[in-house]
Amino acid sequence: VGLINGPRGKGRIEVIEPDVLRLSFRWDRPPAPLEPLILLLGLPRPQTARDLLREATTLGATALHFVTAERCDANYAASSLWSTGEWRRHCLQGAEQAFDTRIPEVSWSHSLESALASLPGGEIRVGLDNYEAPGALGACEEIRKRGEQPVVMALGPERGWGERDRTLLRREGFLLAHLGPRVLRAETAMVAAVSILRALRGQM
């Protein structure tokens, strides 16, 4: 058993009666803090967002900010995925898969520009882009050199970043990088990018 964003432990059923179920718990130490990894995700279709919520939580992202960008459909932010709180269930599934209790901070109501303006500062900033990136993410020495600094990774919407988005990312100090010549689904690109990031840091 586990408490959301708290310790794990073992539960034991002590009493079962027609109107009573009594449990006892023995808690382990709280898990170690996650390495800060903020994902800025161009707001996708709800089904893609569900996959991103689950997989990013499994991979240990600490914050997921779904942002409107030049090539996004802003109506996706009105989906019942967000308005009913369904998104939380997908995060919980991702945490369960990782045998963890922690779920990330999640937002879906900001523009790319406002999300960039709210970043704390001092992070390694990487934007994935298939068209204007000068090199591959796996060859990004900046990540390797800067060790354990927090990372902000920006992944475009399903139609990619627009020119205005790229200008904003560059202005805010993002290094543009690509994942190779093939065009990937958003959820596949996210898993590949986080895996490459972990490998660059010697974590896998």
Predicted segments, located by residue:
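Short, acidic/turn-prone active-site loops that include or flank metal/cofactor-
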Residues: E132, E158-R159, P181-L184
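A mid-sequence, solvent-exposed acidic-amphipathic segment
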Residues: S109-V151
